């Protein structure tokens, strides 16, 4: 097993056989990013679902005034991609950038379609993962509208102290 963090993340949601795991492990694309490297730029079409095997990614947009708006922050063991762009094959509204050296495992369209068709356990996994992503997004939207930036930062550091490492 080359990616124990990835395996554990999958096992957290589904009972994965070694055969099912290896079918995906053999097809992921490994990409290493340095601090401030872009994984995706606004206007590009997302070709991958990225799993953060190690590191930290931030999803943000820049408005017409040049102000930055952070949409999501995710770290080791999470997925962070632009699902809209990936599934619609339309340009992204967001940037995704590494905020420390980061290794991502990329799942492209062909791999996603192959594993969900030939290894049905992944349908369950991605349904659960997408549900959690949706719930997290709703929670973040609520937080953006009900808390100050300082309160959101305090919550983040309290809930994920490893971000300060």
Question: What is each PLM-predicted segment?
Answer:
Residues 22-28, 36-43:
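Short secondary-structure junction/hinge motifs that connect adjacent elements
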Residues 12, 37-98:
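Cyclic nucleotide-binding regulatory domains
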Residues 15, 49, 103:
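Localized chelating/binding microdomains
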Residues 97-165:
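Polybasic "coupling" helices that flank or enter modular domains
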Residues 31-33, 74, 107:
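Hydrophobic residues at beta-strand termini and immediately following loops
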Residues 1-29, 85:
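Cyclic nucleotide-binding regulatory module and flanking cytosolic helices
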Residues 19, 29, 33, 57, ...:
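Generic structural signal for secondary-structure transition and capping sites
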